[in-house]
Amino acid sequence: MSSFDQTMQFHFPEEPAETNVREVLLTVYDALQEKGYNPINQIVGYLLSGDPAYIPRHKDARTLIRKIERDELIEELVKFYLQGQRKG
């Protein structure tokens, strides 16, 4: 059986986050909204492309979001979404 036929597992190291992902995302969201952008579109653009130009410097949002790996941001968003779906 080739390696393409097997499911790969992705493991995140269980270590405390230096930067609170939720706080960063909320700060970035607020900064985008204050500048008149659609926050969801801009954050998705950043997550898909990795291009920090989607995030403004306002409120230091660009610097904050770049301190967190994109895969960590996506992991937190997926966890939050799925936990909300299970409760609702």
Curated annotation (Swiss-Prot):
<protein>
    <recommendedName>
        <fullName>UPF0297 protein GTNG_2488</fullName>
    </recommendedName>
</protein>
<dbReference type="Pfam" id="PF06135">
    <property type="entry name" value="IreB"/>
</dbReference>
<dbReference type="InterPro" id="IPR009309">
    <property type="entry name" value="IreB"/>
</dbReference>
<comment type="similarity">
    <text>Belongs to the UPF0297 family.</text>
</comment>
